[in-house]
C-alpha cells in the first residue's frame, strides 16, 4: 500500500529504518520521486527542486540499494 511523505526529514528517517529495503528514483521533466519500500508500505516523496533531489540522493543510507528509473 502506498503512502506519501511531505517532509525530507521524515523520508530520511523512513529510509534509515530497519525494514527499508530499496529506494527507487523516478525523474520526470518537472519533479523527482523517491520511493522507499518498507515491509508494510511504499513511501513516496516528491521533490520539485533538482538540487535538493541531488543532495537527498547523496544523503541516503549507504547500505540501501538504490535504483534509478
Swiss-Prot record:
Gene Ontology terms: cellular component: cytosolic large ribosomal subunit
Entry keyword Ribosomal protein: yes
The organism's place on the tree of life at top rank: Eukaryota
Record key words, sorted: Ribonucleoprotein, Ribosomal protein
Keyword Transmembrane: no
Gene Ontology biological-process entries: protein-RNA complex assembly; translation
Protein name: Large ribosomal subunit protein eL38
Species, as recorded: Solanum lycopersicum (Tomato)
Amino acid at each position: 500500500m502506498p503512502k506519501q511523505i511531505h517532509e525530507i526529514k521524515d523520508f530520511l528517517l523512513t529510509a534509515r529504518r530497519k525494514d527499508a529495503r530499496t529506494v527507487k528514483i523516478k525523474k520526470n521533466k518537472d519533479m523527482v520521486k523517491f520511493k522507499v519500500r518498507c515491509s508494510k508500505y511504499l513511501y513516496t516523496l516528491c521533490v520539485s527542486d533538482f538540487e535538493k533531489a541531488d543532495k537527498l540522493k547523496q544523503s541516503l543510507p549507504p547500505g540501501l540499494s538504490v535504483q534509478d528509473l
